[in-house]
Amino acid sequence: MAKEELLEMSGTVLEVLPDARYRVTLDNGHSLVAYGAGKMRKHHIRIIAGDKVLLELSPYDLSKGRITFRHIEGRAPMTSRHQKR
């Protein structure tokens, strides 16, 4: 079975929840619960309230997401999935 296409959205972390989860508000106003991707945990990338993040959402469940990138002030934003390696 092929991997389904994921939706990429950007948002802002509202609060840090227990068990390495985060409450995130998307740019369109929708709120959801997200967790950090495995590589973010592996490289100890910390996410705090107020951070701008890039998320992947499944088209089947829009209430949960995976944080794949944390934007850093002063760095140009990533716009495409093809720029990551």
Swiss-Prot record:
Residues 1-72 form the S1-like domain. The keyword Protein biosynthesis applies. Its main location: cytoplasm. CDD domains: S1_IF1. It holds the Pfam family eIF-1a. Keywords: Cytoplasm, Initiation factor, Protein biosynthesis, RNA-binding, rRNA-binding. GO terms for cellular component: cytosol. GO terms for molecular function: ribosome binding; rRNA binding; translation initiation factor activity. It is found in: Cytoplasm. It comes from the Bacteria. One of the essential components for the initiation of protein synthesis. Stabilizes the binding of IF-2 and IF-3 on the 30S subunit to which N-formylmethionyl-tRNA(fMet) subsequently binds. Helps modulate mRNA selection, yielding the 30S pre-initiation complex (PIC). Upon addition of the 50S ribosomal subunit IF-1, IF-2 and IF-3 are released leaving the mature 70S translation initiation complex. Component of the 30S ribosomal translation pre-initiation complex which assembles on the 30S ribosome in the order IF-2 and IF-3, IF-1 and N-formylmethionyl-tRNA(fMet); mRNA recruitment can occur at any time during PIC assembly. HAMAP family: IF_1. This is Translation initiation factor IF-1 1. The gene is infA1.
